From Swiss-Prot:
It comes from Rickettsia massiliae (strain Mtu5). GO terms for cellular component: ribonucleoprotein complex; ribosome. Part of the 30S ribosomal subunit. Contacts proteins S5 and S12. This is Small ribosomal subunit protein uS8. GO terms for biological process: translation.
Length: 132
């Protein structure tokens, strides 16, 4: 069975893993998923990730991050732009998510980046997801 939205599947697996208080979560790997994980790691939402090969299929394993008292570092993670309805935004229309406590992850001509980095580079793009 083929998946229509691999990114939404990854975000759902991460969200469910945090709700279940898991330490790691794994899923099939792709370039866009790795780019999104780079942004999440740079912004401090996940600890680390590694990519491994099993039976000629690439898998990514993500080490989830929790606070000292056991709270998840990600409270919300939602897909914005979907295969059936793409959402594009100029940077001036992206106001701070949750009063700048959360981020939008964008796919821009300069690569996948957070809204903070996009504001610095003054570039908009497709809004992949929002994280808080």
């Amino acid at each position: 069975m083929s998946m229509t939205d691999n990114v939404a599947d990854m975000l759902t697996r991460i969200r469910n893993a945090y709700k279940s208080k898991l330490i790691n979560v794994s899923f099939p790997s792709s370039k866009i998923k790795i780019s999104i994980l780079d942004v999440l790691q740079k912004e401090g939402y996940i600890k680390d990730y590694i990519t491994t090969q099993k039976n000629n299929i690439s898998y990514t394993e993500v080490a989830l991050k929790y606070s000292v008292n056991g709270d998840a570092s990600i409270c919300e993670i939602h897909r914005v732009s979907k295969p059936g309805k793409r959402v594009y935004s100029p940077i001036k229309d992206l106001k701070g998510y949750y009063n700048n406590m959360g981020i939008y992850i964008l796919s821009t001509p300069y690569g996948v980046m957070s809204d903070r980095e996009a504001h610095i580079k003054n570039v908009g793009g497709e809004v992949i997801c929002k994280v808080f």
